């Protein structure tokens, strides 16, 4: 392989340029070529990159000397995807239990609660039940199994046990209908189905309950 004589190299550079050679001259192997002329070996310099005088080599120039690290980028992408997956599983999961797709938890909560709200409103406001009427066995069973257990004071409301559930006027708000528990000791106790709905959300969706309730539940003036 041809070599460059240091003294000849400096001579050629001084002949072509009176200014001293920058200390930050960067040469790549491909930038040097040789030709023979009359038995003399001459050096031709091309594609020479220099740094600024009095400064170090810029990082972007240093990057030109490096090969693209494709494998590292792929590993980084893989790690990022794994991190996203772990965060999703920890917080909000955003994934269903079987991992087969993303779950919109807000829609899921609405699917679980909107039918119950509609069910109670039908009982209270459709005219199916007059004041003092007992709920049908099916309707009472739905209230006792799917709604009342989520009331924050469920045990206190039930007391010695439920005799039946009826519709009545709220004791504090005129003409406002609500549900009442007639207990086995003969006492009648009202309860808020809205508190039951909120309790259901907090029980089944603890990570999303507060934000969902703030977004979808306005402050109510009636304990209906």
Swiss-Prot record:
Pfam families: DUF3223 (PF11523)
Subcellular location: Plastid, Chloroplast
UniProt keywords, alphabetically: Chloroplast, Plastid, Transit peptide
Range annotated as the organelle transit peptide: 1-50
Deletion consequences: Embryonic lethality due to embryo development arrest at globular stage.
Known role: Has a function in the early stage of chloroplast development and palisade cell morphogenesis. Required for correct plastid ribosome assembly. Required for processing and maturation of 4.5S rRNA.
Name of the protein this chain belongs to: Protein DCL, chloroplastic
Origin species: Solanum lycopersicum (Tomato)
Gene name, Swiss-Prot/TrEMBL: DCL
């Amino acid at each position: 392989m041809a070599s460059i004589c240091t003294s000849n190299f400096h001579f050629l550079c001084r002949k072509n340029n009176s200014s001293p050679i920058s200390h930050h001259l960067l040469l790549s192997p491909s930038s040097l070529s040789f030709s023979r002329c009359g038995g003399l070996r001459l050096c031709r310099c091309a594609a020479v990159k220099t740094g600024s005088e009095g400064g170090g080599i810029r990082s972007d120039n240093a990057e030109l000397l490096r090969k693209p690290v494709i494998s590292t980028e792929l590993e980084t992408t893989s790690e990022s995807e794994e991190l996203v997956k772990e965060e999703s599983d920890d917080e909000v999961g955003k994934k269903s239990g079987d991992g087969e797709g993303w779950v919109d938890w807000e829609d899921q909560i609405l699917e679980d609660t909107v039918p119950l709200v509609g069910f109670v409103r039908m009982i209270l406001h459709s005219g199916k039940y007059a004041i003092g009427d007992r709920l049908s066995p099916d309707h009472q069973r739905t209230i006792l199994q799917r709604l009342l257990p989520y009331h924050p004071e469920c045990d206190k409301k039930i007391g010695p046990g439920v005799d039946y559930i009826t519709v009545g006027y709220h004791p504090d708000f005129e003409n406002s209908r609500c549900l009442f528990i007639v207990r086995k000791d003969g006492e009648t106790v009202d309860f808020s189905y809205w508190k039951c709905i909120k309790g259901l959300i907090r029980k089944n969706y603890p990570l999303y309950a507060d934000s969902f309730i703030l977004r979808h539940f306005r402050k109510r003036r009636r304990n209906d």
